[in-house]
């Protein structure tokens, strides 16, 4: 059981922005409105929170919405990745990237090569949502874990984009090119920053071939491509 003192301390952590996770070209290092009241499991819910302008690579799978903090019982834990539990759809999808819900990816699993597989990168965010907290991809805290706030896809429906005005489209049990809060992207004019699993960082143009971008998100599809 999480005690009251620890919940309060975790709230303080949630409220605290971290400069390393903020793109200075996009927004200031400050706390922004927390729009998911009641959603935190192990901490008291704050009014404001620190956010991240960077996201993990979940791979090239089609995004599937999920709403679970994790298995609540031993039985659920045993069935968590077999597809029988709707709330565990993300795990059952067996993502091809390196960081996702309950991921345990080691370097030996990245058979396409560490330098040819994305680790993380800048995330797309509409300019009108930089401070609002109303974007579905930027409404929670830096420390929330697996969520579109911290996780993005390289599926060809979701090419990297320069920040632009976009509608708020809620991903339910479908996915299409209008759901932009799974895209990587940035505020920069011609390219975004992507880090590979070997620690190298490169600029990737918004005009990158969608198939190349997609394959760089998959750690083990055998379709090895050279990052542009």
Task: Please give the residue ranges for each predicted region.
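Surface-exposed loop/linker segments characteristic of extracytoplasmic
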Residues: 1-228
């Amino acid at each position: 059981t999480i005690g009251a003192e620890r919940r309060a301390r975790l709230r303080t952590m949630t409220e605290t922005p971290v400069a390393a996770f903020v793109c200075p070209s996009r927004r200031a290092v400050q706390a922004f409105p927390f729009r998911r009241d009641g959603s935190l499991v192990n901490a008291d819910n704050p009014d404001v929170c620190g956010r991240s302008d960077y996201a993990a690579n979940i791979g090239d799978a089609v995004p599937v919405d999920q709403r679970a903090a994790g298995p609540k019982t031993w039985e659920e834990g045993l069935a968590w990745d077999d597809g029988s539990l709707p709330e565990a759809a993300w795990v059952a999808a067996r993502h091809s990237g390196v960081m996702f819900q309950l991921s345990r990816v080691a370097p030996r699993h990245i058979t396409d090569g560490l330098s040819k597989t994305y680790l993380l990168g800048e995330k797309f965010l509409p300019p009108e949502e930089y401070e609002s907290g109303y974007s579905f991809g930027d409404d929670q805290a830096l420390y929330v874990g697996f969520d579109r706030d911290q996780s993005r896809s390289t599926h060809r429906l979701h090419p990297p984009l320069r920040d632009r005005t976009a509608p708020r489209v809620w991903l339910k049990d479908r996915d299409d090119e209008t759901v932009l809060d799974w895209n990587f992207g940035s505020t920069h004019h011609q390219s975004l920053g992507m880090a590979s699993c070997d620690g190298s960082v490169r600029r990737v143009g918004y005009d990158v071939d969608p198939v190349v971008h997609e394959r760089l998100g998959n750690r083990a599809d055998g379709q090895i491509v050279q990052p542009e």
